[in-house]
Amino acid sequence: MRRLIGVVVLAGVALAGAGWLLTAPKPLPEGSLDGATGDAERGQLVFTAAGCASCHHAPDAEGEARLVLSGGQRFASAFGTFLAPNISPDPAQGIGDWSLDDFASAVKRGVSPEGQHLYPAFPYTAYARMEDGDLVDLWAYMQTLPASDTPSQPHEVGFPFNIRRGVGAWKMLYASPDWVMTEAESPQLERGRYLVEALAHCGECHTPRDALGGLDRSAWLTGAPNPNGRGTIPGLTPDKLSWGADEIAYYLSSGFTPEYDSAGGHMVEVVENFAALPDEDRAAVAAYIKALPEGGHLD
């Protein structure tokens, strides 16, 4: 009996050790972007498409103040409330002392410079598809923004979701850099896929999630409950959205729908971001949306 107990204990220790190793944070290889030089002007377009300011400016900031990425906005979810951190170039309170490698690992792998998992309220599962050139350009642009010494506030997340190592297990289930739309049959559709699935991370809001908070890729962009508990976020598949491509592109530039309604909530800033992009990008997003199948079954 004692031998059996010993075997069980050893097996448990081995399994725990294996789990600990498998869920460890996995940053990008150090120096993987050595020699890369960013273009801040191009980076501004990436910054806009990715909606960085929309989440990281101070609550109620307007105009140029939205370029001060001091954080503080609150994002409610079923797992707790996440507070956007300061990502301004301030070296003490922001990310001013980060290296390009640090930034790349946070954006594409969800790993902090301290080697901790970041919560997926930060959409690194989408940004994992970001091209390296765009990431380097984005980093160059962010260095030009004003610094803020506002301290980041802690997330309001209770047990067991406050155990960061658990995010590693979540990543094993859900963090895939693979495209949802596996085939993009034209350059326009390929660009639309890049904007929707990577930079603009549209799926983070418009796709339903399972009990663990992972995106249900089999129901891609079919709509979802609003994380704040108020209402729903509409679907974009043809069984949910009947707009034509021109109407979609116009909505992304103006915020006005064919039904004479207008964008509301966080979508207001999303529209403002898309309105600042080239016409070709809005047309590419519209082409992608029109290429979606009913029910969002792309797999």
Locate predicted features.
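Sequence context of c-type cytochrome heme-c attachment sites
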Residues: P27-E30, E41-Q44, H57, E64-Q93, ...
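Long, hydrophobic/aromatic-enriched structural stretches that serve as scaffold segments
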Residues: Q93-H117
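Electrostatic cytochrome c docking/interface patches
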Residues: A24-T48, G63, G168-E197
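Electron-transfer interface patches adjacent to heme c in soluble/periplasmic c-type cytochromes
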Residues: G72-D102, T125-L135, W220-E259, V270-A283
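Extended surface/linker regions that mediate inter-domain or inter-protein docking
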Residues: G6-W20, T125, M130-R193, P208, ...
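Substrate-binding/catalytic groove segments of enzymes
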Residues: E114-Q116, G203, L212-G213, W243-D246, ...
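The canonical Cys-X-X-Cys-His
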Residues: G43, A49-P59, F103, L138, ...
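N-terminal export/targeting leaders of redox proteins
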Residues: M1-E41, G133, E294-H297
